[in-house]
Regions:
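N-terminal accessory segment detector
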Residues: 1-128
Length: 129
């Protein structure tokens, strides 16, 4: 059985307060996107488009789960969960989340995230980024 070296841990995020006492926890979005899209480029070149999309989707899901566990938490009421998620996304500068429609009987929800960290301001492409 192999031991994984990079299984996610908040230890990899580190103590930003101690590590960046002068620069703090902010960096420009261009730097975040530079890393994201060059990583995607390398994954696609090595494993193909379909696999790169799957890796990005899976890592985004894991990041969302970890973010939610740490910064949103469980709530008894759905409306309280949404409010906490909206606040966390706004506080971290990730985006402005809105519930556009909600059907509590079928549990179908449409939400949008305006000014999102990943792609707001990108030119339109003929494919999903």
């Amino acid at each position: 059985m192999s031991t994984r070296q990079y299984a996610f841990s908040w230890d990899y995020v580190g103590n930003v307060h101690d590590g960046r006492p002068n620069l703090g926890n902010s960096a420009r979005i261009e730097v975040y996107r530079l890393f994201q899209y060059t990583l995607r480029d390398v994954i696609e070149a090595r494993y193909g488009t379909a696999e790169s999309e799957e890796v990005m989707r899976e890592s985004g899901k894991l990041a969302g789960q970890k973010f939610c566990e740490r910064f949103v938490g469980r709530r008894e009421r759905f409306d309280d969960f949404v409010a906490a998620a909206q606040k966390a996304l706004l506080d971290f500068g990730i985006g402005i989340m809105r519930i556009e429609s909600a059907d509590y009987e079928t549990l179908h929800f449409t939400l949008t995230v305006a000014e999102d960290l990943d792609c707001s301001g990108l030119p339109d492409k003929d494919h999903t980024v």
